[in-house]
Amino acid sequence: MNPGQKQEHDQYPLHDTQFVPQQMDRNSPFADPYPEDQPPPSGYDHQPLLRDNAPSYPPDPFGQPGGYPPQSTMYPPQPMGPPSPNMRYGEAPRRQPRRYKTTRRVKLTHGNLILDCPVPTPYLQAVPIKDTKEFTHMRYTAATCDPADFASQGYTLRQPILQRNTELFIVLTMYNEDEILFARTMHGVMKNIAHLCSRVRSNVWEGPKAWEKVVVCIVSDGRKKIHPRTLSLLATLGVYQDGVAKNVVGDKPVTAHIYEYTTQLSVDPEMKFKGADKGMPPCQILFCLKENNQKKINSHRWFFQAFGPVINPNVCVLIDVGTRPGKTSIYHLWKAFDISSNIAGACGEIRAMSGTAGVALLNPLVAAQNFEYKMSNILDKPLESVFGYISVLPGAFSAYRFTALQNDENGHGPLEKYFLGESQHGADADIFTANMYLAEDRILCYELVAKKKANWVLHYVSSSYGETDVPDSVPEFISQRRRWLNGSFFAGCYALFHWRKVWASDHSFVRKLMFMFEDLYNTYNLIFSWFALGNFYLTFYILTSALGAESLDPKPFSANVASILHTILNYIYILLIIVQFILALGNRPQGSKWAYFGSMTFFAILMVYMMFATIWITVVGVQDAVANADGSFTAMLGESTFRNIIISIVSTYAMYFIASFLFFDPWHMFTSFIQYIFLSPSYTNILNIYAFCNTHDVSWGTKGDNTVSTDLGVVKSKKDGSGDTTVEVEVPTEQKDINEAYEEACVELTRQVEPEVSHRDAKTKQEDYYRSFRTRLVISWIISNLILVVLITNENILASFGTFEVRSTSYLGFVLWSVAGLSAIRFCGSGLYLIFRIFMG
């Protein structure tokens, strides 16, 4: 080296270990050609990629050379002369960045591989804060342990190192969601953190520094399953760097790759960057990329068992990637815990995304689900919140108090029961338990309320909401509801079977009585759902046959025509039921898309005729009741048709309207009510039959992956002279390479994505044809509903109870009044919830 020449050293050691500086060889072909002490040549690009918020590119990167006339082009291009073997057609290949790696000797921390990696220069130039290590370096940890052993194996996180108290610990669980869905959720969380920073008068949040009390944990289920564009988005936030992770450390396979970084950027679903100039505060991100695909419940194990005890938060918020929380929704969830110290869990409203100007509601399937979600949030959740026990806090958007989740000193408690679901799937568990743990969040809710020597309750927060996509195709809808229905049915049986556990808790006697009343209410609902198949058929049979009854005057058409229509439609109904069993026992919904679509269409047509019969009978019944009673309402109640059919139906739907207006949310009654009515036969017949006929299928759609990969590299450890354990690691160290990888991630987000066409493989097609299962549950379900139908419709059986018309009218009145009674209980609970909300917040 010439005297006076500036000596350059690597300024970014990967860890706190002291390294011997190595002189940079300027003659190497891999060296940076423009040292810092020499000016670069003219035209050298100093423009950082994110300085103008988003990269802009000219429409034509290769302009027309001057002096030449415009050249006409032909598409597709025609080869000149004989085709060359090297000629290639199609999209130009993407630029492949080089990976310069240097072998470094790194000292292990408590035997664990931990690396502090500098973030890309273009990122730092685009953000305002760059004075501390949490903003300039990304921390990588290669976890080689089970989640339950994370803390005991010497692993730690940045929050205890920085001595920060965490009030909110938010987890985003994902599998293979794309960058749009991830950005929708992550940007929504960032806006919530910005709202927390605006609460300057709060004793907890204390204004602009509120972000220091919030940690966002992103858990991805499987390194080879994550969407590559989602990884690119995380890289542009500074959270993820390619080439750092390793498969094996010291002969131990890595189970999770943990990246920690405090980002100052957010990306909205339109792929636009938002920073401090747009009001976005910093955000502490903990990205856990699991090596293997082990299902969502294992992701929650990393969150609750590995990271939770280290961070020790007050409130944990669970959000599925794809769900967009409202701008202040997370604050309102947290506020419920702050106001009431005995709240163990809370949830907000789950809304179905309706698209711009509600265009998605033009799909009847989406509209029906929108109505279902709305009425659940207006009637069901408020009632359960008044009792103190909500049967399910949706995993898509809910929150728990971390201390309430903890097990006792013997290891028994809510989390112990919750994580049993990870080992209770497949052949190792009985069919009842395996189906029950399809809805393990219901088990967690019950275990929290029934926790021994505690008086925890669950609460619904109507001012908090999260928006999510709902299935817009028939196969996806049926597959989703199969897991929901089976899980809720068996988990409901579990809660009712263990009703005594509530009496071992420290709840007051009045609260325990309220729980017992709720158990009776749920038992009646469970029995009603068991006989829903028979009840719906009987309702159809009785109403359509009544159009030809002699007592009905006037009739819409002659008795002969009414009888013929009733017979034909009755046979069609029975045929459709048989078809549903055939499809459910031998086919996947994806393999019988048009059969299910046709079935839904025919059931909707039958519902139209059924509604016509209901309206006609109602109008005639009211006229007869008024004429016979001379205007006396008491005398009108004596008319069985008026009392059993008209009042029960009108009161049920009237409560729907009144409750919706009380919650200032009535629009679904006008935009989605009719679609729900027409699809209600499909809810009862198609969804229930498919769910019960597939109780053998206890899968989540994914299978555990236990293989050890080595594509990231293997880290081998050895002892040095001082007795410390060190490893040799190959990681990107040249700032130029780090910057190139960052720019590649940014460019990846600007690339147009071609829609992928999914194809079924031969094995799946074969399973579509050969899967069959018949259990005693399905047989008993069919027989019990069949007996009910025969008892009511047969002329000779139970003749002592009157004629068919008398028996059918009485039973229909029982069914309709049961529906009205259950709706009345929900309506009263909804009203009490609104009253308590006024006085208690």
Swiss-Prot record:
Pfam families for the chain: Chitin_synth_1 (PF01644), Chitin_synth_1N (PF08407)
GO MF term set: chitin synthase activity
Assigned EC number: 2.4.1.16
Biased composition (Basic and acidic residues): 1-13
Pro residues composition-biased segments: 76-85
Example of a GO biological process term: cell wall organization
Any GO CC annotation of this UniProt entry: cell septum
Transmembrane parts of this sequence: 302-322, 385-405, 526-546, 564-584, 602-622, 644-664, 673-693, 778-798, 816-836
Keyword vocabulary terms for this entry: Cell membrane, Cell wall biogenesis/degradation, Glycosyltransferase, Membrane, Transferase, Transmembrane, Transmembrane helix
UniProt-annotated location(s): Cell membrane
Superkingdom to which the source organism belongs: Eukaryota
Membrane topology recorded in Swiss-Prot or TrEMBL: Multi-pass membrane protein
Region entry Disordered, spans: 1-98
Top-level enzyme category: transferase
UniProt xrefs under InterPro entries: Chitin_synth, Chitin_synth_fun, Chitin_synth_N, Nucleotide-diphossugar_trans
Catalytic activity: [(1->4)-N-acetyl-beta-D-glucosaminyl](n) + UDP-N-acetyl-alpha-D-glucosamine = [(1->4)-N-acetyl-beta-D-glucosaminyl](n+1) + UDP + H(+)
Family: Belongs to the chitin synthase family.
Function: Polymerizes chitin, a structural polymer of the cell wall and septum, by transferring the sugar moiety of UDP-GlcNAc to the non-reducing end of the growing chitin polymer.
Name used for this protein in its record: Chitin synthase 1
Organism: Phycomyces blakesleeanus (strain ATCC 8743b / DSM 1359 / FGSC 10004 / NBRC 33097 / NRRL 1555)
